[in-house]
A protein has these predicted regions:
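Alpha-helix C-terminal capping segments
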Residues: 37-42, 80, 103-107, 145
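A short helix->loop->beta-strand "cap" motif at the edges of active sites that frequently abuts
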Residues: 84-87, 108
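Conserved short alpha-helix immediately C-terminal to the canonical SAM/SAH-binding motif I
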Residues: 36, 69, 99
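Rossmann-fold dinucleotide-binding core
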Residues: 64, 94-145
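Glycine/threonine-rich flexible loop motifs
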Residues: 64-77
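NAD(P)+-binding Rossmann beta1-loop-alpha1 motif at the extreme N-terminus of oxidoreductases
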Residues: 1-63, 88, 92-93, 102, ...
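Short, conserved loop/helix-junction motifs that constitute active-site signature segments
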Residues: 77-85
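CheY-like receiver
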Residues: 52-56, 73, 144
């Protein structure tokens, strides 16, 4: 079974995680305020740290507030990338293009994949995903899209 982690279980991230679990992927979640992730305990593993969530994951999705939050989760105080640098990192947050390019240069496998469709699209698993990155990584990620 493919293991995925999703970091950021707010309005968009929580239903995205639930849909990944429903699709049969072993899903681990983390949120900066852990109580926001607890409602997903019925279908996902909830962890207390981002590093714990990403350990052993084949793919890591980030869905957080902005470029600064993604930077902090991935490289800053939460150190998620260091815990699993070989995973396919898929950022679905809306971040600045220059930041996405910087992440792409720092991470072995990275897809910049902002989404459109709002909470309704996340709940119904109908989000439009606009992805930039290598063709190989995109092909690997299609199973989760």
């Amino acid at each position: 079974m493919t293991k995925v982690a999703l970091l950021g279980t707010g309005i968009m991230g929580a239903p995205m995680a639930r849909n990944l679990a429903k699709a049969g992927f072993e899903t681990t979640v983390w949120n900066r305020s852990v109580e926001r992730a607890q409602p997903l305990a019925d279908c996902c593993t909830v962890t207390k740290t981002a590093a714990e969530a990403v350990t052993g994951a084949d793919a890591v999705f980030t869905m957080v507030e902005n470029s600064g939050a993604v930077l902090d989760v991935m490289f800053g105080s939460h150190g998620a990338v260091a815990a699993n640098p070989s995973a396919l990192w898929i950022d679905t947050s809306s971040i600045q293009p220059s930041v996405a390019r910087d992440f792409g240069a720092k991470i072995e496998r990275f897809l910049d994949s902002p989404v459109s469709g709002g909470e309704k699209g996340a709940i119904e698993a109908t989000l439009a995903i606009m992805t930039g990155g290598s063709e190989e990584d995109f092909a690997a990620a299609k199973q989760w899209f």
